[in-house]
Amino acid sequence: MGNSALKAHIETAQKTGVFQLTDKGLTEFPEDLQRLSGNLRTIDLSSNKIEVVPPMMGKFSLLKSLSLNNNRISRLPDELCKLKKLETLHLNGNQISQLPADFVQLLALKTLNLSGNRLKTLPAQLFKLRNLDVVDLSKNRIQAIPDEVSGLQAIELNLNQNQISQISVNISHCPRLKVLRLEENCLELSMLPPSILSDSQISLLAVEGNLFEIKKLRDLEGYDKYMEKFTATRKKFA
């Protein structure tokens, strides 16, 4: 991409607070972008060939939305965790295997998409983020839902297409979780805690494509109670 075209994008972003440069074959963050660290509210560099998120990202103090989908990123810098106003973070289609310890500092974060990465565990940092609403961790390599999950504040959790064979009963204690997607995992029916159906807030449980027939779900204790929640939710949005 030519310098003049990049300059034009940066000039526009200076006025709008939005920098969008997708599918341009970029291999690194545009260095001139740091001139706008006090301006930008949105950055979208999706569908490029970026491998490294530079530490300068931590200087974008007003940033609310960051999209780096479909790049070649394998790790996130600690400095990213300084983005106190960040509400939306899209990182699907990268090579990320873990999150920085300081990820817990992203206290404004509401939406996180890490679909199609290399996570093997459910990141514990997510259980400390009080404003998190939607989490997409589908298409990773996660094998279990741990006991600590009860700290998760999300309303929707997508774990489709992982390798999950174990679920902690504590998933039932997530205070706001209404939508749980577990399609195409490695679950036996016996590994599904009945309390997910009877004692949780969950009104949509998607478990198609596991190691049991979906109609067997009806045999679980608490299924009728779950169906009441499911039907009530459907009526609300009808």
UniProtKB/Swiss-Prot annotation:
InterPro entries: Leu-rich_rpt (IPR001611), Leu-rich_rpt_typical-subtyp (IPR003591), LRR_dom_sf (IPR032675), LRR_domain-containing (IPR050216). Keywords: Leucine-rich repeat, Repeat. One of its GO terms (cellular component) is cytoplasm. Disulfide bonds: none annotated. Signal peptide: none annotated. The keyword Repeat applies. LRR repeats lie at residues 39-60, 62-84, 85-106, 108-129, 131-152, 153-175, 176-196, 201-221. PROSITE patterns: LRR (PS51450). This is Leucine-rich repeat-containing protein 57. It comes from Xenopus laevis.
